[in-house]
Amino acid sequence: MLPVHTEVKPNPLQDANLCSRVFFWWLNPLFKTGHKRRLEEDDMFSVLPEDRSKHLGEELQRYWDKELLRAKKDSRKPSLTKAIIKCYWKSYLILGIFTLIEEGTRVVQPLFLGKIIEYFEKYDPDDSVALHTAYGYAAVLSMCTLILAILHHLYFYHVQCAGMRLRVAMCHMIYRKALRLSNSAMGKTTTGQIVNLLSNDVNKFDQVTIFLHFLWAGPLQAIAVTVLLWVEIGISCLAGLAVLVILLPLQSCIGKLFSSLRSKTAAFTDARIRTMNEVITGMRIIKMYAWEKSFADLIANLRKKEISKILGSSYLRGMNMASFFIANKVILFVTFTSYVLLGNEITASHVFVAMTLYGAVRLTVTLFFPSAIERGSEAIVSIRRIKNFLLLDELPQRKAHVPSDGKAIVHVQDFTAFWDKALDSPTLQGLSFIARPGELLAVVGPVGAGKSSLLSAVLGELPPASGLVSVHGRIAYVSQQPWVFSGTVRSNILFGKKYEKERYEKVIKACALKKDLQLLEDGDLTVIGDRGATLSGGQKARVNLARAVYQDADIYLLDDPLSAVDAEVGKHLFQLCICQALHEKITILVTHQLQYLKAASHILILKDGEMVQKGTYTEFLKSGVDFGSLLKKENEEAEPSTAPGTPTLRKRTFSEASIWSQQSSRPSLKDGAPEGQDAENTQAVQPEESRSEGRIGFKAYKNYFSAGASWFFIIFLVLLNMVGQVFYVLQDWWLSHWANKQGALNNTRNANGNITETLDLSWYLGIYAGLTAVTVLFGIARSLLVFYILVNASQTLHNRMFESILKAPVLFFDRNPIGRILNRFSKDIGHMDDLLPLTFLDFIQTLLLVVSVIAVAAAVIPWILIPLVPLSVVFLVLRRYFLETSRDVKRLESTTRSPVFSHLSSSLQGLWTIRAYKAEERCQELFDAHQDLHSEAWFLFLTTSRWFAVRLDAICAIFVIVVAFGSLVLAKTLNAGQVGLALSYALTLMGMFQWSVRQSAEVENMMISVERVIEYTDLEKEAPWECKKRPPPGWPHEGVIVFDNVNFTYSLDGPLVLKHLTALIKSREKVGIVGRTGAGKSSLISALFRLSEPEGKIWIDKILTTEIGLHDLRKKMSIIPQEPVLFTGTMRKNLDPFNEHTDEELWRALEEVQLKEAIEDLPGKMDTELAESGSNFSVGQRQLVCLARAILKNNRILIIDEATANVDPRTDELIQQKIREKFAQCTVLTIAHRLNTIIDSDKIMVLDSGRLKEYDEPYVLLQNPESLFYKMVQQLGKGEAAALTETAKQVYFRRNYPDITFTSPAVMNTSNGQPSALTIFETAL
C-alpha cells in the first residue's frame, strides 16, 4: 500500500529562531501562498518527529501496558488516567510557568491603573513630579499589556499541541486494539461505537488540556486578588468574594449535571450513528423494499431522544455563559453597596481598581476554572469509554509456525468450541482432521452447519474450548462475503506485496479477471468505490481470490468463493485456480457446488457443528448406497414434512462473514502499486470530497437561522441583545458618575469647610440596583434564547439532510464512501449540536462588549477616534489576509479527517482477512499515515490561529498605550471617573478583542459544517415516491412485464449496462436470467425498480412504470436480494416495519421458511433485538428471512437476485420449493449462477454485455448446440449436463403436452452408469 501522500515539505518550525517562534513569523510564507491561491495538501508541512502517530501511540501504549501489569499485581482495576498522567505530566507541568507569570501580571496591572486614576483625583497642573511619575505608571501598564499579549498565545499554542498529542496517541491505541479484538469482544461493541470513540470522544482531549492548569491557578489568583482588594477597599471586598464563592459550587454542580447529560447524549448519538450506518449501507435494499418511511421514523425517534438531552445540556451551558458575563456586575454591586452602607465614600480609583481586579479574577474563576471542571468531567467520561474498549478481550497472538522440514500442515484433533459460552450447544464439536500440502479438503453441509466456523477455528478466530488446532505455514483466507477496500483493483490484489508483472498476470488469468479488467475504464488501476461499488458481486469474489493466490501462502482457506460466480467462471476458477495454481498447497474449500467434490482429496460433511462423515469421493460411492433413488424419494417426501436439513439459528455471537459485512465506511486509501513502479503508479481517482471555496455565503447563515426560528423571533433576539448591552454599560457609567459627583462634593466641602452637604444615597443605590437587575435578566434571557434557536436549527437541518439522503438516487451511495456520508451525520451534526451554538453565543457577547468599549472610550476622549481609524484598517486587512489561509486550512482539516474513519471501518470489515494475512502492522502504518496527514492540517490550524491572535493583541496593546498616554496629555479636560472608565474598558479589550475576532473566524469555520449539511439537503432527488397518477388498488393483477427497447445506465456519463432490451414476460411466467458476471442481470432488476431512470419503456399490466410513484411501483414487487440485509432492531421490525401483519401471519411466514424453531429459541422470540446487521444469523439464514419478507408481501411479481448463491443445496431446494408453492400464481424472475435452480423455468433469458442474446424455453435452447445456454450447461460436466437436460425435457413435455404421460429414467450419468455428483451430499445427511 502506498504512502498517503508523497511530497512532504519540511517543517519550518524546526529551524525557526526564538523571535520567530514567539511571533510565529515562520508561518509568513504559508500566508503568502494562501493569499495567492487555494492551499492544497502539498502545501502542508510535515508533522514534527515528536508528533508522529507511531511515536506517540507506542509511547502511551507502553505506559498503559505497565499500568495493566501493575493493576494485575495489585488486584485492582487498571486506570487509563494514571497511564496518561505518567506519560505526560512532566511536559505538561512545565507549561504551568506560563500560566503563573501571565496570571501574576494580570493581578498587578490594576494597581498601576489605580495610580494613574489617583493622579487625576489629586490633579495639580503645576506638579511636574506627579506627572512624570504618572508617565512611569503608564509605561509599566503598557509593558504589562505587551507581556500578556505574548505569553497568552505561547501558552495556548503549547497546551493545544499537548492535547493534539494525547488525541493522536489515543487514536493509535484504539485502532491497534480494534485490530486485535476477539470475536466475543466484537459482540460487545459495534463499528458505530468505535467510530464515535474516534470522532467524538478523543476530541475532548484537545479541549481539556487548555484549561487544566486553571484548576490551581484559579484559587491562587483569587487569594492574591483578595489581599489586594482588602488593602484597597477593606472588609467590603469580602461581600464580593462571597458571591464568587457561591458561584463556584453552583458551577461545579452545573458541570456534574452537564457531564451526566453528555454521557446520556453520547449513548443516543452512538445509537443514531450506528443506525445511520446501517441505513446508508443497506440503502439499495431499503429503496427496493420502499422502507424509507419506516427508517425515517426510526431515525427521527432516535434523534428526538438525543436532541432533548442536547437541549438540556445546552441550557446548562447557556447559564454558565451568562454567569460569566453577569458575575462581574453582581460582584461589583454587592461590594460597593456594602462599602457605601458601611459609611465609606466612593472614589474613582477605588471603583476602577476593584472593577479591574474583579475582572482579572472573574475571567479565571468564572470562565477558565468552570471550563476546566466541565472539560475535565467530559474527558473523564471519554476516558472511561475508551478504557472499557481497551479492556475488551483480545485474540491470542498466533505466530505462523513453519516447521523445521519446511512442510506445512493443518492438524485438528477433538476440537470443540463455542462462539457464545452462554449457549449450551457448541458451534463445533469433536472435529478431527489432518490436511497436508497438495491436498484439497472440501467441507460441505447445510446452512448453519459450522462450515465458516471451521475455517475460523483454523484461522485462530474461534478459540478452542477443548482439543487442539495446530497450523504450520502461512495462511491466505478468502471470506464468504468478499472484502475490498477503496483503492485500485491492483492494490486490492497486491495487498502490500511487491508488484511482479509475470506472477501478477498469471494470477489474473487463473482468477478469470482478464476480461473484466479489460472492460473497466482504467483496467486494474480503476479505483474501487466504497464497499466495491464499481464491481459486481462475482468480480469482488474473484478479486478476493486473486489477493489470496498472489500472496503465495502455504495454506488456503476458501469460504465458498464459487457461489458468487456463474457456472462457466466457477468451472474456470476451480480448474485453473484451485486445482492448478494451488495444487501444491493445502486448500480447505467450503462449498455448496457438489459437482466439484470429485476433485477433492477428502470430503468433510458437517451438520449442526459435528462431523457426520469424512472420506474420499470414491469411499462415499463404494458405500453402496443407491444415491439416485434415495435422492428422488427424499425430494418427493420432503414436501409435507420438515426437511432434515432444517437450518437452526447458528449458535454463536458473531462470524466474520456477517459481523462487519454490512458495516460502516470503507476507506479512501490512496494506494496503488508499490514504490519504484512508476508506470504502475498512475491510477484513476475516486471522486474527491467537494470542498467549497471562498467565503461562507450569506445564504448559509440565512438557511441556518431560518431553520431555527421564524424571522420575527430572530429580530426579537437581535433587539434583546442590543438593549441588554446598553444596560450593561449604563451600570458601569452610573458608578463612574456617582464617584465623580462624590469627588466634586468632597472638593466643594474642602473648599468651603461645609461638612453637612451629602449625596442622596437611596437615589444612587436605587438606580444602581435597578440597572444591575435588568442586566442580569437580559443576560440570562439572551443566552437561553440563542441556544434554543441554534439547537433547533441543528435538529431541523439534520432532518432535512436525512430526508434528502433517503430521496437521493442509488448512484449517490455508489459514488460517495460511507465514511464521507457518515462524517456529515456524526462530525458535522456534532459540531452544530454542541460547539457552534456555544461559539456563536460567545461571539455575540464578546462582539457587543468590544463595540461598547470603543463607544465608551470615544465618548470620553473623542480624539481617540483618530488612531482608531488606522488601527481598524490594519485589523480589517489582517483579518481578510488571515481568513484567506485559515478557511483552506480548516477545510483541509475536515477532508483529511474522513480517511481516518474510512480506514478504521474498512479494517473492521476485513478484520479476519487482515489477521489471516498478518497485515495488522501494515494497516497500522497506514492508519498512522492517515493520522499524520490529519495532524499536519491540525497543526497548521492551531498555529495559524495563534499567528493571527498575537497580531490582534498587538493592535489592542497599541490602543491601550494610546488611551493611557493620551489621557495624561489631556489631563486638564478630563475627570478621574472618565479616565477610569475609558482605561478599565480598554484593558478588558486586551484578550476580549482578539477572542471576539477569533470567535468570528471560528463561527465562520464551523459554518463549514452547516454548509456541508445544507449541501446534502439539496441533493439530486430520484422521482417522487407518490404521484397524482396512482395505479388501481389491485394492481398488478396479472404480473405481465413488457420491456420495450430499454437502455439503462447508472449515471448520465456512465456506460450503457443494458442495450436495446425488448422482451415480454407473461402473467405467472417463471423466467430464469443467466449470463456471465457483469452481463447486466442485476442491472435488469435495477431498471425494473427504477434505481436509476431507464430509457425506453417498461410496462407492468399495461401501466408505464415511469408514470407512477416509486413507492407505488416498488411496494408491488417483492425481491430476495443478492446480499441479504438485516437491520439492528427486532425480528418483527425486520419482517414487518410498518406493522401491517398480525403475529400469526409473521409466525406462519417464519414456519414456511423453517426459521420458526430458531426464532422461538431466542430469549425474546420475535422481539429479541438482533445484533448489528443481524450478524448473529448465518448468511443462509438471513436469506431465508428475506424469503419470509417476500411471502408476507404476497405480491404478483417476485424477483430473486442470486438469492441461493450462499446456501447449501438442501436450503436451496427448500427455497425453490417454497417459491414454487407460494408463488405459483406470480410472475417470478430469477437471476441464478446455479443452473439447476432455473432449469425448470418457463423461459430462460440469456444476457451478454447488456444485450438480450437468447430468450426461450430451456429445453428449446438446449436443443441448439450453438446457443450460449447450451454451452453454459455443458461446462458443468457430462453428468450434471445430462441431469439438467433431462429435467428441462420433463418440464417442457409436461407444459406443452400435458396429455402425454412422460416417464424418464433415474437421473443418471449414463456415460458411466453413476449417479450425478449432485446427489452425494443429500444422502450423506
Swiss-Prot record:
What is the membrane topology noted in the UniProt record heading this document?
Answer: Multi-pass membrane protein
| Localization | Basolateral cell membrane; Apical cell membrane
**ABC transmembrane type-1 domain: which residues?**
93-377, 714-1005
GO cellular-component terms in the record?
Answer: apical plasma membrane; basolateral plasma membrane; Golgi apparatus; membrane; nucleolus; plasma membrane; platelet dense granule membrane
Which InterPro entries did the record assign?
Answer: AAA+_ATPase, ABC1_TM_dom, ABC1_TM_sf, ABC_transporter-like_ATP-bd, ABC_transporter-like_CS, ABC_transporter_C-like, ABCC4_TMD1, ABCC4_TMD2
Binding of ATP: at which residues?
445-452, 1075-1082
Pfam (any one)? ABC_tran
User: Which residues does this entry mark as bearing Phosphoserine?
Assistant: S664, S668
SMART domains linked to this entry: AAA
Query: What EC number(s) does its UniProt record assign?
Result: 7.6.2.-, 7.6.2.2, 7.6.2.3
Catalytic activity from the UniProt record: ATP + H2O + xenobioticSide 1 = ADP + phosphate + xenobioticSide 2; an S-substituted glutathione(in) + ATP + H2O = an S-substituted glutathione(out) + ADP + phosphate + H(+); 17beta-estradiol 17-O-(beta-D-glucuronate)(in) + ATP + H2O = 17beta-estradiol 17-O-(beta-D-glucuronate)(out) + ADP + phosphate + H(+); dehydroepiandrosterone 3-sulfate(in) + ATP + H2O = dehydroepiandrosterone 3-sulfate(out) + ADP + phosphate + H(+)
PTM: N-glycosylated; leading to substrate-selective effects on its transport activity.
Q: Which residues carry this modification: Phosphothreonine?
A: T646, T648
GO MF term list: ABC-type bile acid transporter activity; ABC-type glutathione S-conjugate transporter activity; ABC-type xenobiotic transporter activity; alcohol transmembrane transporter activity; ATP binding; ATP hydrolysis activity; ATPase-coupled transmembrane transporter activity; efflux transmembrane transporter activity
**Using the chain's own numbering, where are the disulfide bonds?**
none
PROSITE patterns in the record: ABC_TM1F, ABC_TRANSPORTER_1, ABC_TRANSPORTER_2
What is its EC class?
A: translocase
Q: Name any Gene Ontology BP term.
A: organic hydroxy compound transport
The cofactor(s) it depends on are: Mg(2+)
Supply the SUPFAM superfamilies for this chain.
Answer: ABC transporter transmembrane region, P-loop containing nucleoside triphosphate hydrolases
Which residue ranges are recorded for the region named Disordered?
A: 657-690
Question: What's this chain's function?
Answer: ATP-dependent transporter of the ATP-binding cassette (ABC) family that actively extrudes physiological compounds and xenobiotics from cells. Transports a range of endogenous molecules that have a key role in cellular communication and signaling, including cyclic nucleotides such as cyclic AMP (cAMP) and cyclic GMP (cGMP), bile acids, steroid conjugates, urate, and prostaglandins. Also mediates the ATP-dependent efflux of glutathione conjugates such as leukotriene C4 (LTC4) and leukotriene B4 (LTB4).
Q: How does it assemble?
A: Interacts (via PDZ-binding motif) with SNX27 (via PDZ domain); this interaction accelerates MRP4 internalization.
| Name under which the protein is recorded | ATP-binding cassette sub-family C member 4
What organism is listed for this UniProt entry? Mus musculus
